[in-house]
């Protein structure tokens, strides 16, 4: 902040005609300010672009695709029986000559054995892996919805900090204009301008430094937080979108871009939906339902462990004719094996009970998750309603009132019926109201993003 010198006051009676020239100077400064604040074309990152980049480069989504392929392969593999076993042996070979035709029991034996699955274990294992593959698809839906919410919230923080700097620039410009106007009145001896008037405006200008530091800190932190979703820092040339008015929409449509819903339609969906009912179909809740299905298959697999496992085998034994030429018949053997899982019944019952308890716990988790989502939805709906009321109040009343107050205080000071402190406060109040409206717009957009996270995936479930 540059220093401003305060000249000595000259004779007032000699400078009455300068009052008009001071007013013209103020108009000239305002015109220069407007010309200097034309929009400059820059590379901006819109919310829609940020969302697309975050989803495109998210490693977890790519990992879920690989995990889904893995579970589909596991499902196919689990449908097959165990590999058959082939055996070959020479049996009953005499040790006194090792002749193959010496003893009638000597034979070359080839066998084949096939073990069957235990009950329907393979069927339930296949179903389990199929459900786990479906779980990866739903988990990707949750991740996309979560990414959209988090990226939107971070992007809004970035936009708020950027636009707040714009408001601070506007506040600085107003105070600078007021300083020039007051300085001109004082130096030319117009009206009752005093040295204290200039000092008051200078003090207000100096106090902006702290606000600038805070705003730039918020902007840099939000920018750094946003870059983590892209896997690389944002280029310095990339900036947040700026508008000429804080009342412009903050890309709310981008929050709803995948739903084919307008903002009014989305608000109607929220208003007419019963959260505790509709949010049962939210992907977060569906994940727990799918987990319950997985645990149900684990219960079935545990029950199949109580059944016997069978194995069948067949063998062929070749015998060479006797040394005296007598013919010897070959041997064919058939057999069956079965285990007896009846001696560890207590362990098996405990395994079934554990699997069943885990399934019941998953069902409870589902109900808790639905309650949590529904309660959060109710809070967000109430917050959105209050923010909409505040937004309407600011736009229809406070903005205009503060503008009129600022003009009235400046007129009063110009005619020597007002105080410079009132002029400064009125101008600061005008910018403060605009900043408050910006905060409301940002918070309203954040609330809509959180509601979109809850309702849009559920809406897509019903209208697929």
Could you say what each language-model-derived stretch is?
Residues 2-3, 17, 40-41, 226, ...:
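Acidic, low-complexity, intrinsically disordered peripheral segments
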Residues 3, 8, 12, 16, ...:
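Periplasmic alpha-helical coiled-coil/stalk elements that build and connect Gram-negative outer-membrane
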Residues 22-36:
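Bacterial N-terminal signal peptides
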Residues 36, 40-44:
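Boundary at the C-terminal end of the N-terminal hydrophobic targeting segment
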Residues 51, 182, 275, 408-409:
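Generic hydrophobic alpha-helical segments
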Residues 51-118, 232, 276-345, 350, ...:
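A small-residue-enriched
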Residues 63-78, 143, 147-168, 201, ...:
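Amphipathic alpha-helical coiled-coil segments
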Residues 110-114, 118-135, 140:
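A broadly used, surface-exposed interaction patch
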């Amino acid at each position: 902040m540059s220093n401003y010198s305060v000249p000595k006051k000259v004779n007032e009676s000699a400078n009455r005609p300068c009052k008009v020239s001071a007013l013209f100077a103020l108009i000239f400064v305002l015109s220069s300010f407007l010309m200097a604040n034309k929009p400059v074309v820059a590379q901006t990152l819109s919310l829609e672009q940020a969302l697309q980049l975050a989803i495109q480069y998210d490693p977890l989504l790519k990992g879920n695709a690989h995990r889904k392929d893995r579970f589909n392969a596991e499902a196919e593999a689990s449908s097959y029986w165990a590999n058959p076993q082939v055996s070959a042996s020479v049996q009953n070979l005499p040790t006194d000559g090792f002749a193959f035709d010496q003893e009638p029991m000597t034979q070359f034996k080839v066998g084949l054995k096939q073990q069957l699955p235990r009950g329907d274990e393979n069927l339930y294992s296949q179903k389990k892996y199929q459900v786990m593959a479906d779980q990866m698809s739903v988990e990707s839906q949750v991740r996309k919805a979560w990414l959209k919410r988090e990226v939107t919230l971070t992007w809004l923080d970035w936009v708020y900090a950027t636009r707040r700097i714009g408001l601070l620039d506007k506040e600085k410009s107003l105070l600078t204009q007021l300083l020039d106007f007051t300085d001109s009145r004082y130096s030319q001896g117009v009206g009752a301008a005093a040295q204290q008037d200039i000092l008051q405006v200078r003090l207000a200008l100096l106090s902006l430094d702290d606000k600038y530091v805070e705003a730039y800190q918020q902007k840099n932190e939000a920018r750094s937080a946003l870059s983590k979703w892209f896997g690389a820092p944002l280029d310095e040339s990339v900036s947040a979108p700026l508008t000429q008015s804080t009342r412009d929409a903050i890309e709310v449509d981008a929050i709803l871009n995948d739903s084919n819903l307008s903002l009014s339609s989305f608000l109607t969906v929220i208003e007419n939906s019963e959260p505790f009912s509709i949010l049962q179909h939210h992907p977060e809740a569906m994940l727990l339902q799918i987990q319950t299905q997985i645990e149900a298959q684990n219960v079935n697999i545990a029950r199949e462990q109580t059944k016997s496992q069978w194995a069948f085998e067949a063998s062929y034994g070749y015998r060479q004719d006797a040394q005296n030429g007598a013919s010897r018949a070959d041997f064919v053997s058939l057999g069956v094996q079965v285990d007896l899982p009846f001696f560890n019944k207590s362990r098996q019952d405990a395994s079934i009970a554990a699997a069943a308890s885990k399934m019941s716990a998953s069902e409870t988790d589902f109900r808790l998750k639905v309650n949590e989502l529904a309660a959060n939805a109710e809070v967000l709906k109430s917050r959105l309603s209050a923010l909409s009321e505040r937004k309407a109040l600011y736009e229809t009343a406070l903005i205009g009132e503060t503008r009129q107050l600022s003009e009235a205080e400046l007129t009063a000071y110009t005619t020597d019926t007002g105080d410079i402190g009132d002029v400064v406060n009125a101008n600061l109040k005008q910018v403060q109201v605009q900043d408050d409206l910006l905060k409301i717009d940002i918070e309203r957009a954040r609330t809509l993003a959180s509601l979109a996270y809850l309702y849009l995936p559920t809406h897509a479930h019903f209208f697929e």
